[in-house]
Amino acid sequence: MNSIKLKFNCKDSLWQEHIGAGDFSFAAIFLTTWGIVLRAYLDTDDVFFEYGLSRCEPVSQRDGIDELVPDRPFNLKFDGSMTVKDTIRRADSVVYGTPLVQDGLEHETHRETDPKRETFYSTCMLFLDGPKSPIDADVVEGTILDDIEFEMKPVVNYDMVVYVLSGKVCYLSYNVTRVSDDQAAHVAATFETVAKCIADVPHRLVQEVESLSQLDVDRLKTWNAYQPIAVETCYQDLFRQRCDLHPNSPAVIAWDGSFTYDELDHFSSLLATRLQAAGIGPDVFVTICATRCRWIPVAMLGIIKARGAFCALDLSHPLDRLKDICDALKSTITITTPTDSNIARKLASTVIVIGGDAPVESDRITPMNDRPKPINGHPTNALYSVFTSGSSGKPKGVVVEHRSFVSSALASIQPLDIRPHDRVLHFSAYAFDISVFEVLTPLISGATIAIPSEKRRKESLTHAVQELGATWALLTPTVARLYDPDEFPSLRTLALGGELAQASDIALWQSKNVVVIYNPAECCPIGVSGPACPADGKFLGWSHTCQRAWIVDPRDHDKLPPIGAVGELLIEGPVVARCYAHDPNFSSPDSPFIQSTPSWMLRLRSNTPSGTRLYRTGDLARYGSDASLYYMGRKDSQIKIRGQRTEPGEIESNLHSILSKDKLGVAIVVLELRGSSKIIAFVSKDTGGLGGDSNTVGQLRIEAATEETDVCITKATSKLHSIMPAYMVPSAFLSVNYIPISRSGKIDRTRLKSFALSLPQETLLRVNNGLETGDLPESNEEHRLQRMYSLVLGISRDKVGMESDFFRLGGDSLQAMKLLALAPKEGLTDISYEDIFRYPRLKDLARKASQSVTIKKDGFGENSSVIHPFSLVIDGQSLIDMAAKQCDIERDSIEDIYPCTPMQASIISLAVKGKIMPFLTFGLALRDHVDTKRVKDTWHAAYRANSLLRTRIIVCAETGQLYQVVVGGDIFWDDDECGNFAQPKSGPSASIGGPLVRMKLVEGQLSIAIHRALYDNWSIRQLLNDISGAYNGLTLPSRPSFNCYVSYAARSLEAASSFCNAELGDSDLDAAKYPEPVSQNSHTNFRAWLGIRVFTCQKESIDVLASEFQLAWAMIAYARTNKKDVVFGVLSSGRSNASKDTKEIMGPIATVTPLRVTIDGTQDVGGALEELQYRQEEQAMYTHLGLRRIGQLGRNAAAACQIQTVLIVEPDLPDLRGVWFSNDATLPNHSDADASNYRLTIKCVVGPDCTDIFAIFDHQSLPIMEVKEILSQFEHILGQIHGKEASQLSVASIDTVNFKDWDTLHKLTEMPSVCRNGLLLSDPTILPQGQMKTFSAVEEAAAHCAFQDSLQEASIARDAKMQPKEPLSSADLISEINRYDLAIMRSRPSPESILLSELALTGDSHSSGTHTVFVTGANGFIGTQILRHCLEDPTIDRVIALVRGSSANEARSRTEESARRAQWWSDCHSQKLEVWPGDLAMPHLGLNETHWRRLADRTTINAIIHNGASVHWLKRYADLEATNVGATAQLLQLAVANPRLGFVYVSSGRYTDPNAESEEPAAANVAATAMPYSQTKFVAESLIRRTAARLPHGQTQVRIISLGLVIGDPLTGVVNADDYLWRLIATCVQAGEFNSSAGSEWMPISDVTSTALAIVQTALNPAGVPATIKPITGGLMWSEIWDLVTDMGYDMEPRPESEWMATVRRDLEREQERHPLWTLSHLVESRSQLNTDAGAGPAWADAWRGDEATTRNLKTAFRRSLRFLGEVGFLPGQKGQNTDGEVNGRAFTRAW
């Protein structure tokens, strides 16, 4: 046991007068003081402890220690209205009126089981002198202290013992296994505070005695020093930001479908528009009446966008309760789905139906990015309401504002470990406020809401989580303990809330990241959380930054108890709700919302603003020593049922109203039975007993049930079910002889609870229900159900028979879920949740289980449009024979035959002639831990469901007609496990008769070859989306077969021909001849790509933008040919205005059709655009006709089909996302393949705020300069059409540029370019209009060469005009970034290049799953550790290190030497290592041609770790540029061109949060440092930031690791002795002093091992790092650093900065080159650059901060590094010898 001396001077106080007068004893004063302390800590007026008195003899004469025992009980009942003096007198009477304790029995009897007493389980007070006259303190202090430890031994069974030695000397002794040192210190301080308070003013009331010590005050000031962080933003603004950032990320994945963020934004905006029209605005409530589905988030967001507030109704609640909620909110509008519309119409006068065929879902005409007209909203507007139980009998509606929820949600994301790619399970009932959190929080964190069906949620949660891929879930402990964590493989984080988690719950789920959460509904769903603590289930965690937690006196919230005391939890901050809906003005006298700021808060935090929101939770809690919170119970009778707050008063109030006519009294208690909470209702006919004394009315007993009572109870139960949720209806009714009351006149629930617990459970239930067991089970099903009933309900099997009713045995809905969870283990898979309620008797449920027949569904529905097999051909039988022969299959396997479409016929013709590759191949890399069998099974299911995948092509020899043949059988898998994926042959046999879909699955790579005749862009993406859904367990959607489209095309052939003839029959014969056609012989397939970017405001739909592009191109053709009749091709999706069935058909519907545009100069631009849009809509009906058939309509139509230019407009689609394949899948692009058939293709890829326009052309027949002019002209014209003043322009007034002077203009606007470090650099062109900026990039390469030749052909040149001046300004830095950035953008590969490269990748190292990592800077201090972790990582097969050296041997030797210096090299490391000699400052990194080709071939390297750099503080920017910037840009070219290539750049950090840093301000700061090295690193890092920002959504392979100072590892301590940190320490050690002014400043520091490991892990899994830049967190304050140095034995004195600087300058001047800081002296003079000047530089952002564990590990590594530096002679050794600055070969250094 440990002891603390208490400061208490009884002799100098007023007590001496009273003691001397005999008013009361010396002991009574101390006993009262300790009693008041316990009263404060335990929150009780009934205090019990024990005490002992010794004889009044000198210490030296005491016989032994037996006299020092607590042999007297002390029980004092405090009355707050009594004075302290009167209370001491009462204590004195207790001292002289109580007998001795015999054998400790009294001691055991008074030990409380109340959880509030757990800290003070037992305490006592021992007096070492008599109770009347204390002995002299001086004698005591001189004689007794040596004996204290010995004399404590007899009382070690107590948690705390107060030794009273005299009026001046007291000691608090405590059991260290039960009481911490910190806790004891606070108790001691409380004792001293109470003692002083009652001594100073003995006439004050007990309730006025101050128990808060100064120690408590200081600690509370530290914990709650800062006000909670409020986010003054509306929710919809945050959601809009997330939509703008990642529009195509999945927002919702549900059992009934899914939404991307863009789609969710679109549908909710449509709903918001309707709600606004209906009058919804700020603080107007709309209810949501719908079962769990994907439309719930749409409803919530629609209401929010309309600036209304929502309340989601729990449809499991009775209709009357739902009506009460609607009435309380004054809601007249409800949103529902078709399934629940009947209920909704009973609740509101206006019902809006969404989902299904409702207008909100089907209205696709509205642009996806349209949002409702803004209405003035404010963060203080109501966001939602949730209803909790109310003691008055009516539920209470909590009104939560935008600022409250937003502040709470944003502050919760990090503590709860919610990540951007998480799938958050939407499980909670809508009566629970957590349900709001589960929907709204993921949508502002970038996560996905995973919504199971109600059936899955109740019956098979494990399957629901697996199917949806949920990674984050929140469950109540009661629900969590129903399941096995192993059945949730996808789940990473489980939050437990709603009720206390037991230690067994936490132990059960320990394989997951388990967090506990807390907050009442009045303070937003979550505001306190922490990692689950198995040792203490009462642990709640810490408050989030959005709120502060205060523990107040439960009797008076204007008073604070001591830290560690049990008190009422009070929450402060913006998270506090506005009010209750029924009490907006806080008129209720017992309102828990505090309206005035308590005085203690103003005292502890003087800057607390007025209006601070405070809420009294009613929960009892206590502080831990680290500001954590522990739940200790309730101060009132409120209870939790299945996580729901329940007021017994509400249940009692309703029961009273029901039973009052029957003159029955009622009372409610809650018992923990069979692992769940049960509500027990006591009823009594003796209403007089309510007011009687239990001693007079007799023993509480069960009354025999009467028929009259049973009727009343049955009536009450039925009525309760109609007005209250099922969980609030009592599980049992007990008829008792009376209802006991307490002394205060209230129902004595404690006695009722004890009485109920004394009854056997079977008796409890039988009393109410008259249990019948019936016959014993016989069948297997009956025995299994008997066992299940017994296990779930916790009763013996012999009590369960055939007549046993699950619910009459005590079951409820929660235990029904448990029964279902157990059913599969018992072999009963056909029982549903509804079945248990429908057939609760065992015999009925067994009969249902035995009669059920499992119907295995493949998930394919009937097509809405059915075309009978062979109905589209005339001679079906002869075609079957022909197909069987050409396909080499049996006749019986042929399911259907129908004609090919014109588009398919054209593709087959080109493929047979060898003009195009018939098959396009792409690969999908499977994610880790994906079930490959499940992947195959899913593809098999899709193959069977989709007839197009089973389609082959045959040709009729007599007519040449092409037909499609649908065959049975299974998918064609390539069984070659070792070799490459065999490419289908070219030529006729590749397209005729054979399978058109082939697949191979080897080592985590799914390779797919699909014929062009089977798909278009929409089809292939939709196919993969469907398969992803099926893999998740969703039903494959039923889609019409492709024969429906063939039938539609045949039926509309005549109408299509008539339309096209009318459109093109009179067109100019030369209308389509731009560019001028070339002869067939001169046509080549060498395609070049040229691109520009224009910034477009996509307020219009993509169709509107398409019309602008079409008009711009028509004006170009007109300007260059002087012909007003213009014809060019457009690629149509074929789905724009087709029927619903046609839109859903998979197949090659997209096709190129001629578009005719007649230039009318008198027409205004707006009119011309409207006409083009109308033509698009009309023409979309007939795109299936095809160019060949159109050309047969006549001479003019045939001429129009000789189109030379095709315009393609398509959205910038993101990479597909799936739970089974990685996000970097590059899909074949049908439009790019078609581009090779035309002389010029203009492809416009429309993004959110810009459009990339590519020209794809044959550069041998169409000069590059001409195409550059065309694109510049296109941009110029488009800028006028798209501009704000376009509506005022006529077509004739559009400036098309005078091309006679084009060459002159081009020379004037062209900026100088240079080729630097192997990169083509040029400045962007800025046009006079100022509306658009472009980048220009030229790539000339044959398709089979991809892009690599352009890299190899780049030459080195430096134009003197482009040489940056020294020193560089911020503008110079931005200019440098721009020039390099243009060259990097040039490396963006064409989709065709990606496609062709994908073909080359099949079967290579990527397919086989091998990993090769390329590392630069591998022989430096950090680089060698990176190399080590790469070589030791089992997932990496080969490591290639680029190292400077004249030969491979020299480079390898340098690499191994560095590894040995770092003390990790062994011969086994050489097996995977390959060293390439090179030089980062050279073109192609100084690699030879072979090595460079391997680096750039997109197959050899999987990841690049770029750590190499020239680190020198004295060189100019120009000297460092090639190595630090040029090399980075060259490597970035490779990363941009290869979506599979991971790229990690190792950089150095700056003060700010690296992911929140803006380029221009950062450039200004870096330029101000005038440090060329830092400037080169900044330029390189900015290039990577820009590159990452441009990457397609989902392509996340480019990352930056940002470092602070790096020290040695904890094992060896090897460091780079040239680092500034060590040179500074050596300087201070040498001077014997350090700068004390900077002691409180913090520096980011990491050890080299953890740093290198983080770099390698990021390279292998860049998608695992959510942001572009990952700072390596952790660090130390300078004071901690100096403590570590001095702890190593170095004597140094703290000095103010001015004195310290003077010493350093003096030493520098004296020693010069020999001084450790000589080469870095400029850093000493400009310390603000490294934040070492107190107050001179900004503090490091919180993003750099680490946790306590990181700090501990850092200190260990720091000590080892210091020891290493002493060992190598850099620092003085243990004997204190001076260092001359020389370091032996064991440390790393730099060549200055």
From Swiss-Prot:
Annotated spans, Condensation (C) domain: 895-1285
GO molecular-function term, one example from the UniProt record: ligase activity
Domain Carrier: 779-853
Coiled coil: none
Keyword Isomerase: no
One Pfam entry name: AMP-binding
Renumbered residue ranges of the record's region Adenylation (A) domain: 239-642
UniProt keyword Ribosomal protein present: no
Pathway: Alkaloid biosynthesis; ergot alkaloid biosynthesis
GO cellular component: cytoplasm
Listed PROSITE patterns: CARRIER, PHOSPHOPANTETHEINE
Modified positions (O-(pantetheine 4'-phosphoryl)serine) in chain numbering: S813
Family affiliation: Belongs to the NRP synthetase family.
PANTHER family listed in its UniProt record: NONRIBOSOMAL PEPTIDE SYNTHASE ATNA-RELATED, NONRIBOSOMAL PEPTIDE SYNTHETASE
Descriptive protein name: D-lysergyl-peptide-synthetase subunit 3
Organism (species): Claviceps purpurea (strain 20.1) (Ergot fungus)
Name of the encoding gene: lpsC
